[in-house]
Amino acid sequence: METAIIVLAAGMGKRMDSDLPKVLHEIAGAPLITHVLNTVKNLEPQKVVIVTGHGATEVENKVTQFEPDVTFVKQKIQKGTGHAVNCARSHLKDFKGSTLIVYGDVPFITADTYADILAMKEKNTDMVVLSFNSENPNNYGRLIVDNGELIRIIEAKDANIDELNIKLCNSGVICVDNDLLFDLLNKITNKNANEEYYLTDIVALAYAQNYSIKTVICEEPETLGINTRLELSHAEKVFQEKIRKLAVENGATLIQPETIYFSYDTEIGRDVYIGPNVVFGPGVTVESGAKILPFCHLEGCHISQGSQVGPFARLRPGTELSENVRIGNFVEVKNSIVSQGSKVNHLSYIGDTSIGENSNIGAGTIICNYDGVNKHRTKIGDEVFLGSNTLLVAPVTVGNQSMTATGTIVTKDIPQGDLAIGRTKQENKTGYANKLMKLLKSKKKRKDP
């Protein structure tokens, strides 16, 4: 079945109290609308049209970073969901198939649920509405059903007391033949409490014309929409619990999992150990058998099998750790490759650097990669030993099996097998410590009132 998707993303989100368009607020490092698009693309639709409104340019710029193959149309004046869908007409006028209407601020409806809707649509059904049962329906629209057929949807503001007692609620998601959709939209009016064009009004119109209308029922948590900061916080919690559970089910060990925060795209292998208070930013892959110790922050990095990171380490974008690498406490690595068996165990900054195999980077080593204008690269070879407190002023190359003495400042290449000593010669001034201390104390005494 040919399928088109319309994503409604025009809402101002007034209750978010934010300059940022509502659909661009993030869960686990990705905008709400990106979660929706990641799900619906599993349906392999022939066309995706996103209806924007408030902050249209921002939404378009952000979405195209994730999903370049979508079409945008702007709802210039917000006149309701029916009007928003109608804005997509020009982009779907020649489409023959089913159109699925979803919402950019409802991120938790699963691919399986959407697939169930399409499967129901294929069973000689003209329209399918996604619904859910709720013990506290509040402001949700109610579904009026008779003998298994959906008759109409009544918005809570327009419902009478009997209708408000109905537990079967509208999720907002509708799948309908494309031609029928726009034919029905021509007939809806704004004669309601909000003076808006409701998409839901097409249900009663379709029923009056003897079209077949069915419902698919999902679990209420799937339909969670984000309208306030509090709901956004709750959605983050829901997502984190879901992805933590998935990581454990796939063979990872999470210590105090409630303190571990994943990104939407984090990939965790089997037998990975993750300690408490670890934060994953976007773009992190951890291979099987790796260990992430407590209080680490990781983003845009790849950690290979058997490697260990932390505690208190930070891996920034562009970092690649090969097998059996050790990154220890208070180490920051950015845009660097650390090859198999190498160690950076403590108190170091490694930036724009490649480190060969089985090298040891001493405590306090700093790669001076930035001259105030440009970044420069450093190359450290295999089986290199850098003494503690070594500074490498990039660009510089350290050859295989070479060494630096403690406290060395490296400003030129070190050939293979050489020892570099780049510090001033120590001079001991006999008895000068006592003289200096007396001088300092006398100066302090003169300054004191």
Where are these regions (language model features)?
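N-terminal nucleotide-binding beta1-loop-alpha1 segment
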Residues: 1-18, 48
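Short beta-strand segments
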Residues: 8-9, 51, 102-103, 129-133, ...
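Short glycine-enriched, charge-decorated loop/helix-capping segments at active-site entrances
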Residues: 20-26, 188-191
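Conserved N-terminal catalytic core of the sugar/cofactor nucleotidyltransferase
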Residues: 31-102, 108-113, 439-442
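Conserved core of the sugar-phosphate nucleotidyltransferase
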Residues: 57, 109-193
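Conserved alpha/beta core of the MobA/IspD/sugar-nucleotide pyrophosphorylase nucleotidyltransferase superfamily
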Residues: 169-267
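Structural signal for interior beta-strand "rungs" in well-ordered beta-sheet cores
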Residues: 253-421, 426-427
